[in-house]
Amino acid sequence: MATDVAFDTSMGSFTVELYNAHAPKTCKNFATLAQRGYYNNVIFHRIIPNFMVQTGDPTGTGRGGSSIYGEKFEDEINPNLKHTGAGILSMANSGPNNNGSQFFITLAPQPWLDGKHTIFGRVKSGMRVIQRMGLVKTNSEDRPVDGVKILRARIVEETGDE
């Protein structure tokens, strides 16, 4: 049974599919935070065109956020998973084994991130919303001038009879 997480944002909705088999600890953290409402009303604090959109920090600064395991937890790097294109769901970190609640979604291939960030899913639907986010006007610190935020995140259990 796959786990999907649906996001309603100020720019539209999108759904991500989690790679539970490849990054079980990361997926459990992400799904649990979403289920608890942790991501509700959190802004996308960093958007870089042709690179990625980043969110998951309840302080909105890019320096906050914690995991369900405490402050930070270890990477789950899978050599078979790569940042090969747009729509890759990956953990943001400030170095090895430093994962909390922040995550990003790629807007294009980012091979230099391979082996440095845990890939734990992909955008399943609503990629156009993510692409539109990547085009918003930002300031010199890559923060959107007009706020882009997650209104609500929720778990969508897939039964397999799609």
UniProtKB/Swiss-Prot annotation:
- Provide one Gene Ontology biological process annotation: protein folding
First and last residue of the signal peptide:
none
State which Enzyme Commission number(s) the record gives. 5.2.1.8
Answer whether the UniProt record assigns the keyword Thylakoid to this protein: no
Got a GO cellular component term for this one?
Answer: catalytic step 2 spliceosome
Q: Does the keyword Transcription regulation apply?
A: no
* Pfam families for this protein: Pro_isomerase (PF00160)
Provide the GO MF annotations for this entry.
peptidyl-prolyl cis-trans isomerase activity
The reactions it catalyses are: [protein]-peptidylproline (omega=180) = [protein]-peptidylproline (omega=0)
Q: Kindly state which keywords UniProt assigns to this record, in alphabetical order.
A: Isomerase, Rotamase
What InterPro entries has UniProt attached to this entry?
Cyclophilin-like_dom_sf (IPR029000), Cyclophilin-type_PPIase (IPR024936), Cyclophilin-type_PPIase_CS (IPR020892), Cyclophilin-type_PPIase_dom (IPR002130), Cyclophilin_A-like (IPR044666)
Q: Where is the PPIase cyclophilin-type domain?
A: 1-155
Name the family: Belongs to the cyclophilin-type PPIase family. PPIL1 subfamily.
Summarizing the function annotation, the protein's role is: PPIases accelerate the folding of proteins. It catalyzes the cis-trans isomerization of proline imidic peptide bonds in oligopeptides.
Record-given protein name: Peptidyl-prolyl cis-trans isomerase-like 1
The organism is Aspergillus niger
